[in-house]
Amino acid sequence: MPSSSALLCCLVFLAGVAASRDASTLSDSSCTQFPTSLPHMLRELRAAFSRVKTFFQMKDQLDSLLLTQSLLDDFKGYLGCQALSEMIQFYLEEVMPQAENHGPDIKEHVNSLGEKLKTLRLRLRRCHRFLPCENKSKAVEQVKRAFSKLQDRGVYKAMSEFDIFINYIETYVTTKMQK
């Protein structure tokens, strides 16, 4: 009987080692395939945003931009990683929860958009060369301050500019793939 327990224990251990190795290989292969899957992920983000774009852009009565050139400059520069990470977090934790409060249809589409953004963030984090961050972005802080000052209108402004954010993501990741 003790030998069958030892054998079972060894089999469980070997299965765990094999699963761990397969997961590592899967993660490595998903990182090598990330540059080719990125355009598809960005298309999905744009398609999900298109379902709420008109609603939020019609409600946005402000002429100023929330997502400015200084933010794009951070995305292109050495702060790109941090700017991207902070902006994803900003949209997921501050903007989208407020955006969901505009009816069940809007909530459903904003939820879908949020899930796609979470998937992108997860893929970026798995592939460390795309999201190895340390420093804070001043441009993101400016966006957050402007968003807060706008109060209720901030959600319309931030959501109406989500397509600009997708373009900034694309710029950041494209820059990283060229390095």
UniProtKB/Swiss-Prot annotation:
The keyword Disulfide bond applies. GO terms for molecular function: cytokine activity. Keywords: Cytokine, Disulfide bond, Glycoprotein, Secreted, Signal. It comes from the Eukaryota. Its main location: secreted. Glycans are attached at residue 135. One of its GO terms (biological process) is immune response. PROSITE patterns: INTERLEUKIN_10. InterPro entries: 4_helix_cytokine-like_core, IL-10, IL-10/19/20/24/26, IL-10_CS. Residues 1-19 form the signal peptide. Disulfide bonds join 31-127, 81-133. GO terms for cellular component: extracellular space. It is found in: Secreted. Belongs to the IL-10 family. Major immune regulatory cytokine that acts on many cells of the immune system where it has profound anti-inflammatory functions, limiting excessive tissue disruption caused by inflammation. Mechanistically, IL10 binds to its heterotetrameric receptor comprising IL10RA and IL10RB leading to JAK1 and STAT2-mediated phosphorylation of STAT3. In turn, STAT3 translocates to the nucleus where it drives expression of anti-inflammatory mediators. Homodimer. Interacts with IL10RA and IL10RB. This is Interleukin-10.
